[in-house]
């Protein structure tokens, strides 16, 4: 683990109450297999990023009801430099507020990774490494999965992606659209360049113009959203 300035900062927002998940424990710690819980699957790409040789700082945004999650993350101290910050109650009580809380602690490129999203498909664990290297020229790159289920897209960051391949770009983007027709994908992770990172909270604003339009896209086969149990892709 490096204590020097990071090449990439990963924001991990863990302050939510998991109302839709409906369990009496933190959804991040829901068991998927012996010794593996949801947040472990969510962090696979982050660990791969650190093992690629880049210096990675993980900024975990939490509240006191998530101290069990904080304790679980101690097992990642060997691979990741971690900073824990209590979500600022003076900010909006949502994803945007969590991002704003974390931003003063970020350096370098900034990635947003959600603790209830797990990538699936061959090579998906390398997708964040690829996305970090593809933020230019727009200053943005998304890890995304194509999916056409309207119910899924209404609960996610919906995208319209252009042609498949290494040159895929975001043509349109909207957070949890009421009318998802015209969208064919959703993002699982977002990476911003240092000059664009201050705009990260905007991706969580419903009905607002999204800074993700024009972003590069790294495609994965799919991802599981453990908050709503829907899987695009």
Locate the predicted segments by residue.
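Conserved beta-strand scaffold positions in the cores of enzyme catalytic domains, especially
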Residues: 29, 84-85, 140-142, 214-217, ...
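Active-site glycine-centered loops adjacent to acidic/histidine catalytic or metal-binding residues
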Residues: 16, 116, 228
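Short, well-ordered coil/turn elements that cap or connect secondary structure elements
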Residues: 5, 53, 77-79, 135-137, ...
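Conserved beta-loop-beta/alpha segment of the NTase-like Rossmann-fold superfamily
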Residues: 67-163
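Well-ordered alpha-helical segments embedded in enzymatic catalytic cores
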Residues: 38-42, 97-101, 171-172
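Conserved beta-strand termini and adjacent loop/short-helix elements that scaffold enzyme active sites
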Residues: 61-63, 85-88, 144-145, 173-176, ...
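N-terminal glycine-rich phosphate-binding loop and ensuing alpha1 helix
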Residues: 2-69
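Catalytic-core segments of class I nucleotidyltransferases/pyrophosphorylases
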Residues: 111, 125-129, 133, 162-233
């Amino acid at each position: 683990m490096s204590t020097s300035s990071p090449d990439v900062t990963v924001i991990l927002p863990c302050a939510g109450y998991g109302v839709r998940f409906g369990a009496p424990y933190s959804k991040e710690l829901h068991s998927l297999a012996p010794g593996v819980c949801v947040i472990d699957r969510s962090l696979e790409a982050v660990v791969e990023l650190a093992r690629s040789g880049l210096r990675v700082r993980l900024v975990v945004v939490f509240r006191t009801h998530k101290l069990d999650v904080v304790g679980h993350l101690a097992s990642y101290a060997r691979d990741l430099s971690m900073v824990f910050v209590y979500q600022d109650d003076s900010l909006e009580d949502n994803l945007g507020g969590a991002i704003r809380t974390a931003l003063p602690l970020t350096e370098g490129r900034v990635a947003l990774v959600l603790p209830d999203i797990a990538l699936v498909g061959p090579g998906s664990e390398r997708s964040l490494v690829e996305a970090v290297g593809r933020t230019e020229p727009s200053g943005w790159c998304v890890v995304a999965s194509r999916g056409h289920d309207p119910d899924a897209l209404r609960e996610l960051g919906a995208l319209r992606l252009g042609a498949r391949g290494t040159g895929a770009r975001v043509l349109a983007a909207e957070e949890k659209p009421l009318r998802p027709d015209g969208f064919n994908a959703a993002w699982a992770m977002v990476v911003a360049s240092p000059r664009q990172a201050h705009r990260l909270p905007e991706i969580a604003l419903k009905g607002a113009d999204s800074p993700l339009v024009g972003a590069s896209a790294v495609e994965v086969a799919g991802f599981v959203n453990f908050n709503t149990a829907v899987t695009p892709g």
